[in-house]
Design a protein with these regions (language model features):
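An exposed acidic His-Trp-rich patch
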Residues: 96-105, 194-242
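Hydrophobic h-region of N-terminal signal peptides that target proteins for export
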Residues: 9-17
């Protein structure tokens, strides 16, 4: 009878472990699907900074903003006008004489499409830029998928939020600094030592930007990212098996935020995504 009981306990433990591993695999599959989507990070092919006045855009080399081949040679003009009370206005002037004012809100910017090419205006700091995507990009076509560390339940923590709400400076790869809201420090214990990370917010999640010794050879040099649900009763479900690479891994046209200095962990976080072998080289060292 004792043997039966022990066997059932072992089986139950294996079932829980298998269920956890399956949940991580499911997250990895969703991540892969997002990366392969027709407007995901792998489709990013251009980033242009608007100057006051007219900015021509199209595939012809004479344009201010040169799009990939396949786009119209003369797609139009983007006119940046500064209005004293309303702020900056961007108008897309088409060759047929029609025009469209382009919203550049973070939530839902206006998107202009021409075949497989699309673009929209975004704001970074006090500057406006045009982000260009191509659903037929070579990076997307040649994507071989991500590699992951083996699932490691030891790097899944019930962490504690130590409230200390304040704005913290976050540097991006352009050298710009934005002040972001942080709720406090999230602390956890690992192998008898206490560690902490300071997250910011992203939509309805906590957003962690962190570095660790694996960045030297195993993971992306500039660090990785991790999202968690918002705290419940002061507790945070912190699972490093959900760690992923920033968009700068795949393209030089992203504007990735960099981990704050206090988010450098001294131990190797061997969980989550590994460095992409065909990834874009890290060019952020001079900013850190």
């Amino acid at each position: 009878m004792l043997r039966v009981a022990i066997g059932l306990m072992i089986l139950a433990g294996m079932t829980v472990a298998d269920s956890y591993t399956d949940s991580i695999r499911a997250w990895q599959q969703k991540r892969d699907a997002r990366l392969r989507s027709q407007d995901g990070w792998l489709t990013l092919v251009g980033l242009f900074w608007l100057k006051p006045g007219d900015n021509t855009i199209g595939s012809a080399d004479s344009n201010d903003f040169v799009l990939p081949k396949g786009a119209p040679a003369r797609l139009g003009r983007l006119r940046l006008t500064h209005l004293q009370l309303q702020g900056d206005r961007v108008t897309f002037l088409k060759p047929d004489g029609s025009s469209q004012e382009l919203s550049y809100s973070d939530e839902k910017p206006d998107v202009v499409r021409a075949g497989s090419i699309s673009f929209f205006v975004m704001k970074r700091g006090d500057k406006l830029a045009v982000r260009v995507k191509d659903s037929a990009s070579a990076v997307l076509k040649n994507f071989e998928g991500m590699k992951y560390f083996p699932v490691n339940p030891e790097l899944h923590f019930e962490a504690t939020l130590i409230p200390d709400p304040k704005k913290i400076p976050i540097l991006n790869i352009l050298g710009q600094t934005e002040l972001e809201d942080s709720p406090g420090r999230v602390e956890f214990s690992y192998k008898g030592e206490k560690y902490g990370l300071r997250p910011i917010y992203e939509d309805d999640t906590l957003y962690f930007l962190f570095k660790d010794p694996t960045n030297k050879t195993q993971t992306y040099q500039a660090g990785r990212m991790l999202n968690t649900p918002l705290p419940v009763n002061g507790k945070v479900d912190l699972d490093f098996n959900h760690s992923y690479n920033p968009p700068c891994t795949f393209t030089p046209y992203a504007t990735c935020p960099l981990p704050p200095k206090e988010n450098a962990l001294p131990f190797p976080v061997e969980a989550g995504e590994m460095r992409y072998k065909n990834g874009h080289a890290d060019y952020t060292a001079s900013l850190r």
